[in-house]
Amino acid sequence: MGFNKDIFTVDLMLGIPEKEDRSDWYTFMEPLLRDEESKSMFKMPAQYMFKDIPETGSHDDFVQYALGEMDKHHINQAMVGFHEQSEVKILAGKNYPDRFFFDLPVNPNTPNEAANIKRIYEEFGIKAVSAFPSGMYPQVAINDEKWHPIYEMCVELDLPFFCCVGVPGPRIPMAPQKVELIDEVCWYFPELKFVMRHGAEPWTALACKLMLKYPNLYYSTSAFSPKHYPEDIVNFANTRGKDKIMYAGYFPMGLSLDKIFAEMQNVPFKDDVWPMFLGENAKKLLKL
């Protein structure tokens, strides 16, 4: 069978723009940026890694624009970062609940963040929680005790925790996202469903070893074009980990869906891996 457009597909990282200029998506990172190129020349802080950042243009209805891109590439559902002040995202979830669902970006430096997760969950029905440990100021390592109330709330509400791991693309310190730190978190919170984001490089072999060790540890392919999927991850999916690896894109932050799906068909997944990777694993984990 291999890759084909008829496989149910869930994109675990897709953005809905609200205007053509998306530079305000990255203001949270400004206190960490020190080199002039990152501060003043890039459209986004990891632009040196992404040659063709999508230009979305201006649209009267960005939700319809996002749906059009999804339909073009046969994406059935997409997970979008939720912001309570965003009318666009609230309307997307309200008007198209069969197409969009949400993760809530969190920061343990924010007072009462765990209580806020519960409030947003009860009011808006988020499906997951997400974080960028190296991108927050001050940075907070994955295994720092500051995360414990958030991890506990994720367990209480049965919400998966999606976390950037490995060397971050922006020129900021990597220490908070070392893959080895996940070991302590999964040990201390065995019921926490932890999903790695953004590569886990250069520690992909360790990421696979930890996924074998912990039943609730997963990996999503966000921010990587398919031709650059780590070999360790592809091999793991084809052997002992087909229920652990899930598709996530990076549109429009750094990759176009045209590029992703043009390259996707060349990923050497086994036939029985494709449905799991593209949608079935996400449906099961997130109860879609």
Q: What residue ranges belong to the model's regions?
A:
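Active-site environment of divalent metal-dependent phosphoester hydrolases
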Residues: 17-19, 85-88, 109-112, 136-137, ...
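Catalytic pocket-lining loop regions of alpha/beta-barrel enzymes
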Residues: 127-128, 141-246
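Short, acidic/polar
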Residues: 59-68, 110-121, 204
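Hydrophobic/aromatic residues located in beta-strands of well-ordered beta-sheets
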Residues: 9, 78, 100-102, 161, ...
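A structural motif corresponding to the C-terminal end of an alpha-helix
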Residues: 68-76, 96, 156-157, 188-192
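Active-site gating/metal-coordination segments in enzymes
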Residues: 76-77, 83-169, 176
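Mid-to-C-terminal alpha-helical segments outside catalytic/metal-binding sites
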Residues: 1-12, 19-68, 72, 77, ...
